[in-house]
Amino acid sequence: MKGIFEKLKRRIDILLYKLGIRPLSIETLKELKESRKEREVLEFYDVYMEPEEFVDIEKYEFILYEGDIVGKTAESLSKIFKGNLFPSRNELRYMGVKDEVAYFKKVVIYMIITFLALLFMGLLDNNLLQGFVNGLIGAGIILVLSLFYPKIRLILFKGEIKLQILFTLIYMISILRAGASLPEVLESISKSREYGVVAFEAKSIIRDVNIGGYNLVEALERAKMRTRIPILKKLYDQMIVGYNKGNLPLLLGKLYEDIVRESMVKLDSSKFMIQNLGNLAFGVGLILPFTGMILSTMIGNQGFSGILSTINLLLLKIGPLLTLIFGIFVKLKIE
């Protein structure tokens, strides 16, 4: 009986590994190694040789690697949606994601969890078919949302990127005026996480110079072609011109002033629009529906419970949703 349970546990571990949910444990890998040895049958004319002992158990992971369902599915999804519909690899790295396959691997795992959860809920309600349909719909919603999530996050991330670039410009101007060269400044920025996206870009530029064999101007041109952030393109333009012609601190100072001035102008021009939209949104979205529902409740003689239901709907559902949408709009307009 103990052997049956051990085999069942091993099969469950292998299934979870194939689904990409958890890695194989050292014990399971050792068991796979031993079972593989047992299956090797010697012919009578073979010369017996002691099997090679691997110190690193992880070398046996190739036995099951080909069956990684989640990995293959994620790879297929990344090939389908890669391009204009989906952010570039660099933009994903800004978000802390290694690449498209790693992102879609997480998406597939969430889809599987959602499907199984809704299927289980349908099973509890004695309606397996409805649970299966709900699971498919839920997994589909997760997939659709996953396509738009990175771009929405990058749009909301614009203001933080602008602040990171402004702090980087202040640092670069002060260090360059102190006598440091541009390669030394980029090396220093790449070692500090405080500069966020700019630190990542500086690492890419240094890698192009040290490993790719490009000179600094060519590496800056490549970085300019890779990025989709307009402010970074302006920064690279100024760095290229300043490195070739000289007086880089002055050019970076002008860029800093332009970014701040543009942000202030945008903020001033958006004040009137944000104020009017706020009055319209909360007036039409909250006050008018609240008044109408209260009147209909009183006319329909629904009593105090009807008034509480109306307040619950407006304050706990419509209100927070409206506030979230308005907050996103304000953030986009300001940044």
From Swiss-Prot:
Q: Which domain of life is it from?
A: Archaea
Places the protein is found: Cell membrane
Query: Where does the chain cross the membrane?
Result: 104-124, 128-148, 280-300, 310-330
Pfam families (UniProt xref): T2SSF
What InterPro entries does the database record attribute to this sequence? Answer: ArlJ-like, T2SS_GspF_dom
| Topology class, membrane | Multi-pass membrane protein
Entry keywords, A to Z: Cell membrane, Membrane, Transmembrane, Transmembrane helix
> Which Gene Ontology cellular component annotation is one that this UniProt entry carries?
plasma membrane
Protein name per its UniProtKB record: Uncharacterized protein MJ0780
